[in-house]
C-alpha cells in the first residue's frame, strides 16, 4: 500500500528512463512532477535541453526478434512505450538496426511530455531526495554530485559508486569445454572458475595481439575519468609480460587436471598462463573474463580474446567498456520492481540501476513507472515474467552476485531458458525464446 499522502508522484530526471516513467505514471491518471536540471545546469555530455536525448549513438541497436534488444523493443511497443513510439516515428535507414533522427525524436518526446495535462515539468537541480511523495529517481549515469551524495547516504553509505571498466561476458554455450577446466586457485572452496590454459607460445602470440590492438576513442567528457579507474588489460599488458603473468593471467595454483589432454609445455603440471572465466549470472549461462576490463574496439576484442583457448568461437553477449558511471548495488538495494528495499516510496530507474544501454534504460523506467503508479493506487506490484526480455532485466540486476555486479545489456543469456532439450541452431533457439516471450507477455497483459 502507498505510504504517501501526496496527490502526485515525483520523477527526477528526464532522460530515457525518467521520460518513460513519467509517461507511464501519467497515462494511469496520476499527476507527475518531473524534475530536470538541464536548462538551468548543463552536463558534460548533453548538447540540448530536450528530454530523452541520445548522447552518443543514435541507434537503438538490432530490430530482429532473434536479437535480444529487438525482442525488448517489441515488448516495449506492446506496453505503449513513449520512447519506442517516438523512435519509430523518427526512424532513419540503418539496415537491420533501429536508428533515429536524434533531434526530431527527442523534440517529439519533449513536446509530448510537456503538453501532457498531468505532467508538470520543473527545470531545477534536485539536491535532496523528496520525502513528500512517491519518487522515481532516474537521474542518469552521471548524477550530479549533490544528489549522488544523498543517494549514497540513503543507502547507508553503501552501494552507490563509480566504475571505470567492465570485462567482456561470453555465452557459456559457445565455450569449447574440451579446452578448459573447472578449478579454483589452490582448490580453495568450490571449483568456481573455468580456466583457459596457455602454453608459452600461445601466450606470446596473445600478448603481441593484445599490446598492438586498436583502442576505442574516448569521448571528450570521458578523458579525465579514464585515468581515475581500474586499469584496462591492454594498458597493463604494455607494462610488461611479468605484469600479466603475476597479475590477471597468473597460473600459480591452477595446475592441469589429471585428465587434461590439451597442449602443454613439456611435462609441466602448471600452464604458462591462465585466463579465468567467472560465472556471471545465477543460471550459469554467462561467464565474464576475470580481470579483462578493456577499452579496445569491439572488433578488436573479438579478434584478440578469441585467441584464448576455449573461446575461439565464443559469443560475446557484452564487450568490455571503459567509462565512468554511477550505479547502485542493485542486488542488495532494490526489489525486482526497481523499488528500494529500505524505502517503499522510492524507486530507481535507468543506468544507475545497472542496466546498460538506451533501450534497457527506457525499459527500466517503464517497469518503475508502472509499479510506482500501482503503489500510489494501493495495488499490488507487478513483476514481469522472467521468460520476457523486460522481465529478465530487473531479475538480473536484482539477483546477480553483488560482489561482482556490473551493468548489463539485455541478452538471451539472462532470459529464462527454454524447457526441454537444447535447440542447437542458435537462430531457431532465439526465435523460440522470442515467440514464448511475446506469448507470455500478452498473457500477462491480459490478466
From Swiss-Prot:
PANTHER family: GLUCOSE INHIBITED DIVISION PROTEIN A (PTHR11806), METHYLENETETRAHYDROFOLATE--TRNA-(URACIL-5-)-METHYLTRANSFERASE TRMFO (PTHR11806:SF2). It catalyses: uridine(54) in tRNA + (6R)-5,10-methylene-5,6,7,8-tetrahydrofolate + NADH + H(+) = 5-methyluridine(54) in tRNA + (6S)-5,6,7,8-tetrahydrofolate + NAD(+); uridine(54) in tRNA + (6R)-5,10-methylene-5,6,7,8-tetrahydrofolate + NADPH + H(+) = 5-methyluridine(54) in tRNA + (6S)-5,6,7,8-tetrahydrofolate + NADP(+). One of its GO terms (biological process) is tRNA methylation. Catalyzes the folate-dependent formation of 5-methyl-uridine at position 54 (M-5-U54) in all tRNAs. It is found in: Cytoplasm. Its main location: cytoplasm. This is Methylenetetrahydrofolate--tRNA-(uracil-5-)-methyltransferase TrmFO. SUPFAM superfamilies: FAD/NAD(P)-binding domain. GO terms for molecular function: flavin adenine dinucleotide binding; tRNA (uracil(54)-C5)-methyltransferase activity, 5,10-methylenetetrahydrofolate-dependent. Its EC number is 2.1.1.74. FAD binds at residues 13-18. Coiled coil: none annotated. It holds the Pfam family GIDA. InterPro entries: FAD/NAD-bd_sf, MnmG-rel, MnmG-rel_CS, MnmG_N, TrmFO. It comes from Streptococcus thermophilus (strain CNRZ 1066). Keywords: Cytoplasm, FAD, Flavoprotein, Methyltransferase, NAD, NADP, Transferase, tRNA processing. PROSITE patterns: GIDA_2. GO terms for cellular component: cytosol. Signal peptide: none annotated. Its cofactor is FAD.
Amino acid at each position: 500500500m502507498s505510504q504517501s499522502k501526496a496527490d502526485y508522484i515525483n520523477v527526477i530526471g528526464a532522460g530515457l528512463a525518467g521520460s518513460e516513467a513519467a509517461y507511464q505514471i501519467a497515462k494511469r491518471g496520476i499527476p507527475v512532477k518531473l524534475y530536470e536540471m538541464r536548462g538551468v545546469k548543463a552536463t558534460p555530455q548533453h548538447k540540448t535541453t530536450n528530454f530523452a536525448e541520445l548522447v552518443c549513438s543514435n541507434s537503438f541497436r538490432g530490430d530482429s526478434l532473434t536479437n535480444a534488444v529487438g525482442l525488448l523493443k517489441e515488448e516495449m511497443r506492446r506496453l505503449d512505450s513513449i520512447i519506442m513510439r517516438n523512435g519509430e516515428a523518427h526512424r532513419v535507414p540503418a539496415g537491420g538496426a533501429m536508428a533515429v533522427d536524434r533531434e526530431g525524436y527527442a523534440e517529439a518526446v519533449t513536446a509530448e511530455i510537456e503538453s501532457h495535462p498531468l505532467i508538470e515539468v520543473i527545470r531545477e537541480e534536485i539536491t535532496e531526495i523528496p520525502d513528500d511523495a512517491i519518487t522515481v529517481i532516474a537521474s542518469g549515469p552521471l548524477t550530479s554530485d549533490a544528489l549522488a551524495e544523498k543517494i549514497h547516504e540513503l543507502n547507508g553509505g553503501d552501494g552507490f559508486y563509480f566504475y571505470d571498466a567492465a570485462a567482456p561476458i561470453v555465452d557459456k554455450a559457445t565455450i569449447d569445454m574440451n579446452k578448459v577446466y573447472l578449478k579454483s586457485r589452490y582448490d580453495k572452496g568450490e571449483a568456481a572458475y573455468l580456466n583457459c590454459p596457455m602454453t608459452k607460445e600461445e601466450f606470446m602470440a596473445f600478448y603481441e595481439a593484445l599490446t598492438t590492438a586498436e583502442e576505442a576513442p574516448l569521448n571528450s567528457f570521458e578523458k579525465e575519468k579514464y585515468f581515475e579507474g581500474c586499469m584496462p588489460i591492454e594498458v597493463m599488458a604494455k607494462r610488461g609480460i611479468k605484469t600479466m603473468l603475476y597479475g590477471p593471467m597468473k597460473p600459480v595454483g591452477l595446475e592441469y587436471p589429471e585428465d587434461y589432454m590439451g597442449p602443454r609445455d613439456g611435462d609441466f603440471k602448471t600452464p604458462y598462463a591462465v585466463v579465468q572465466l567467472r560465472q556471471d549470472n545465477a543460471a550459469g549461462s554467462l561467464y565474464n573474463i576475470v580481470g579483462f576490463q578493456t577499452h579496445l574496439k569491439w572488433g578488436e576484442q573479438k579478434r584478440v580474446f578469441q585467441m584464448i583457448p576455449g573461446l575461439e568461437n565464443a559469443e560475446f553477449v557484452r564487450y568490455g567498456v571503459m567509462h565512468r558511471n554511477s550505479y547502485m548495488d542493485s542486488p542488495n538495494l532494490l526489489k525486482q520492481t526497481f523499488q528500494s528495499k529500505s524505502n517503499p516510496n522510492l524507486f530507481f530507474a535507468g543506468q544507475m540501476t545497472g542496466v546498460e544501454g538506451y533501450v534497457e534504460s527506457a525499459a527500466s523506467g517503464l517497469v518503475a513507472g508502472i509499479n510506482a503508479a500501482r503503489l500510489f493506487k494501493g495495488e499490488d506490484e507487478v513483476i514481469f515474467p522472467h521468460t520476457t526480455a523486460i522481465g529478465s532485466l530487473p531479475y538480473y540486476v536484482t539477483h546477480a552476485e553483488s560482489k561482482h555486479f556490473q551493468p548489463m545489456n539485455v541478452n538471451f543469456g539472462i532470459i529464462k531458458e527454454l524447457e526441454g532439450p537444447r535447440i542447437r541452431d542458435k537462430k531457431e533457439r532465439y526465435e523460440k525464446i522470442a515467440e514464448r516471450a511475446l506469448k507470455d507477455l500478452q498473457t500477462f497483459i491480459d490478466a
